[in-house]
Amino acid sequence: MTGGMALSHKTMTKSISSITGNTNKQISIKAARSNFEREPLIRPFGFKGGYMTEIWQTASMLESESGARKVGLCSQSVLWSDASVFAAHSESGGNALMYAMTEYALTLLKGRSFNNPIDLLDEILEPVYDYGKKITNNNKLRETFALNALVSVDNAAWLLYAKENNIDSFDDMIPGEYKETLSHHHDKVASIPLMAYTIPIKEISEAVDDGYFFMKVKIGQPGTQEEMLEKDKNRLSEIHKAIGHVTTGHTENGKIPYYFDANGRYEKKETLLKLLDHADKIKALDQIAVIEEPFPEDREITVGDIGLRIAADESAHTDKDAIKRIEMGYNAIALKAIAKTLSMTLKIARVAHEKNVPCFCADLTVSPVLVEWNKAVAARLAPFPGLNMGLLETNGHQNYKNRDEMISYHPYPDAPWRKTREGLFFLDQDYYQKSGGIFKDSIHYLSLIH
């Protein structure tokens, strides 16, 4: 337990033995259905060389034979999960394909029984993935596209599992073999904003003034490799000039860390090294804490000789992929319970933990309710190197046009632990007792289904 005042695990959770005997209950799914709504963005959101203007919010409901009903949520990201699908279709068309995979998964679940959500995901992932290849006419469809489509289904399965087994805390819900991986209870988690291509430098400076101290910056801008590199060098120079001198008490060196996300846009290691040479020239190199997904996944470029912390995200589709990336020199993993399902995230996190590879939680521009699923993981991971706390990227407040209305859908919209203050989430006993509100139904999303 870390991060300032450590909260007692015993005060937050029931003993594991108190729920033993219920956790293997066979749950039969009587009904499954879904719906979605579109949430517009404030401005076009750019990464991977593309731009999206809205995010589909999907809700999946599972009902058991006992009459229990639970709704899981998903914020779809076609561009993130498979840029080739995004490029081959209209924005709505790509979203419709992913949603069709969610609907297909629900048809597979009707009449099916399960003991735990992890096994359930293992059973349906391959057929849903194969269905996705068929409807997208893309035999090279990225597996992350299928996982993204299954987030709402998986969340609903976890909530139904908890309901049927009388579990009301995140700690008790996590199976025993994963508890060591998520054994911390931080009282602070760093809140990381995202600076996409179109975010003005003025807004980046304002974010720092508001207390944010760990900055995620999208690199790999549109254009040829040469054009991309020049744009990224200029962007880095502008950002470093604006905030590079700012000090913080939250890091070991007192400087603001930069977290670059290239989303696989750098086709060669030499090109990335040119960007890092530029960073060195402007004295920004020592502030680069993480570079996420610099290279295309299919290039299989090793990264152990780059000399910085390189994180895998979308290339670590599964726990097996995470092992491969670690063997290639990747020394951090960006976890996304809100993009690859909680079930798969637990597997990936355990692999990383066993190999002493630090993890943090990255966003997918998800809804305020879904932020809590990511926060639940970030709050329990080992502290990130150089910090005495967990890391959680969240950027929905920067991008959703109707963000205030979306906050009202949260079961505890006014809870202090829901909000970022001075670049931090402060997580007290109330937060851990309520598990961020994930077990309490959201009236809005219930009504979307019913």
Predicted segments with their positions:
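Metal- or metallocofactor-binding catalytic centers and their adjacent structured scaffolds
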Residues: 70-165
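Conserved, mostly hydrophobic/aromatic
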Residues: 60, 67, 153, 166, ...
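N-terminal export signals
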Residues: 1-15
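Catalytic domains of carbohydrate-active enzymes, especially glycoside hydrolases
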Residues: 206-220
